[in-house]
């Protein structure tokens, strides 16, 4: 069994990280959840990359909204928000179904705070923290910021679910990883759903947040970052489709080339979106390395399949252009392996999955075809050196689109006629009550 230099480097890198983790364990440095439970130190494997999940942190909704809206509405807001925070913190975000349901219910009641007629948009200071280290990132008094954070969390949960599907816990008898066709299609559906959440954030929520508030928000919520993740999700969906096409005997060479070229377009767009963002804190640099890695893989795939199409021609120029494509694909594949290592070692450290799908096929085929075709047409390359230029890749309309997302209907509690019956307290009196409470404290 041949072991490439790429795998040796990866092994050394991961061994170094493992030793580092072991030393940390032998000392006193241990990460703990807020409830005091020890957090397992492990290096996660990543197929579908999602920036670190942000979850709600404790904030006093009761005090901020007391007397302004009915008590049952305040209680429902507080109860749902606390439930989301506790479940996410306790499970590390793995209770996806429960969290998704709670987030949908919370959105339904939260929407009322964004309505201008209620005058409550800037009264509550909403706090969010990083799930991994528990560090509080942002504290913003704006209901639209809270809505953005909730929908963003739904998108991250959906990406995590897709990642889980693509990392099976069992292996086939042959020792190779097997992901069923149904699981791959489910993962594509989830990626389109996540892209829809993020597109909604960019188009319908960010525009409602004042510029001065945007400056104080987490860098993960920049419009360029959100757009990049949305487009990246479409790219990963296309990569899965390319893998399915490679496995299918009915898929033509033209179909495979089209999918490979679309894959490249998605990652080109994602790179353009994120390149103009401030990536200094958090997961920014790791996110950039992920996009670079997948961009280089996509470009290698596009040139490989374009070369196969050109090689079908009968003219010498067709074969020369094809060989140029194959050699370019081989070089890009080498660069993609380097980018993969940089992605894995960027903080927080992760593991690359074993080669799967389209890229497993291409890592085997590209070096083989490049070597064979360059030997076969070496005499043409020597005779026609002036024609040794890389041909342009064809442009295609993109096939995948984000799923449409709409907010749930506003909770009926906001439309009830009980507000007057419960004696809605004037804002002025409410503020006076708050001052009295502060003095008492």
Predicted region positions:
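Acidic, Ser/Thr-rich intrinsically disordered and amphipathic helical segments
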Residues: 79, 98, 105, 154, ...
